Amino acid sequence: MKLTCVLIITVLFLTASQLITADYSRDQRQYRAVRLGDEMRNFKGARDCGGQGEGCYTQPCCPGLRCRGGGTGGGVCQL
């Protein structure tokens, strides 16, 4: 009798933990390598253009930004 109760409680606990874990990971990607690949693709150093507030002396500004303040130190990408 005690063993049956322990087994029932264990099954209920494992079922509840599976449901909680499934709900938590619903919007996350399954494979860590895919997430890392996306992070490397969006890495700041991998872009070919300067973002807002970055210098435009050595690289062009990203689309939608303009190089402003082209003094002696070069300009800054701004809207």
From Swiss-Prot:
UniProt subcellular location: Secreted
SS bond partners: C49-C62, C56-C67, C61-C77
InterPro entries: Conotoxin
Gene Ontology terms: cellular component: extracellular region
Residues annotated with 4-hydroxyproline modification: P60, P63
Record propeptide residues: 23-47
Keyword presence, Electron transport: no
Alphabetical UniProt keywords: Disulfide bond, Hydroxylation, Ion channel impairing toxin, Knottin, Secreted, Signal, Toxin
One annotated GO molecular function: ion channel inhibitor activity
Statement: the UniProt record of this protein carries the keyword Nuclease: no
Tissue expression as described in the entry: Expressed by the venom duct.
Main localization (coarse): secreted
Endpoints of the signal sequence: 1-22
A Pfam family the protein falls into: Conotoxin
Function: Ion channel inhibitor that inhibits the increase in intracellular calcium upon depolarization in DRG neurons. In vivo, both intraperitoneal and intracranial injections into mice induce hyperactivity.
Entry note about domains: The presence of a 'disulfide through disulfide knot' structurally defines this protein as a knottin.
Family the entry assigns: Belongs to the conotoxin O1 superfamily.
Protein name: Conotoxin Vi6.1
Organism: Conus virgo
The organism's taxonomic lineage, starting at the top: Eukaryota, Metazoa, Spiralia, Lophotrochozoa, Mollusca
